[in-house]
Amino acid sequence: MTDRDDLLGWEAVGRLDLDGRGFCTGTLIAPDLVLTAAHCVYERKAKSLRPADKILFRAGLRDGVAIAERRGLQIAAHPDYDPGQPPSIQNIRHDVALIRLTEPITSRDADPFAIHSGRNAGTEISVASYGVGRAEALSRQRSCTLLTERDDVIAFDCNVTFGSSGAPVFARVGGRGRILSLVSAGGKLDSKTVGFGMTLPQRIAELKAQLRRNPVAVPDRRIKRLQAGTGRNSSGARFIRPGGG
């Protein structure tokens, strides 16, 4: 999106800067909750969760300027996602995480997206993401195709690249898209390059319950907000073959 006006209605999609170690895409689903891929919130080598306060959500980022910026306060990654294992259908199915922010972002700045909860999403979908070569501005593929859904894993022909991980895949429902899935990985299906994601309602419900079971103290909001960091490298969609271990 080359103009700030192009962002209208899409401000809730932002870049997740990972303490200078790359970035992913995240989306507000509540004023203080960002939805992204689980593999984005893990340290690659240590296979442990990144410190929440080292993750910076930059809503509606364009040319170095965000609509709003917040640090992470708490992370919930799906317990059935295994960061120690290579990409697989099992991991794609559970590659979901929520990040609670230190302070809500008001709806007048960025209106959170709803989750698609039905089965009849149709085959026409869209994706909005940051990625290699377009890290400073949100890029939106307005039309791509849902190819197949099986065992809570979705395949689509949307263009995914490094940095696209965690990007929302939208079903066209009513006047505003609803989040159908997240970009988890890229791979091959019938010799075609495709993206893979997962169904979301059950996973998100489980992650919200996890956050409620493990509450953390909200910092004093009188403290000055932390400033934006930089994320020069990219941490993005993995390229795998379906069923690969």
Q: What is each of the regions a protein language model found here?
A:
Residues 1-8, 42, 47-105:
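Conserved catalytic-core segment of clan PA serine endopeptidases
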Residues 6-9, 28-29, 48-51, 89-93, ...:
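Extracellular/periplasmic catalytic domains that process cell-envelope and extracellular macromolecules
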Residues 9-56:
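Catalytic histidine site
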Residues 14-16, 53-63, 123-129:
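Short conserved beta-strand and strand-loop elements enriched in small hydrophobics
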Residues 93-96, 101-160, 164, 201:
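Chymotrypsin/trypsin-fold serine protease catalytic domain
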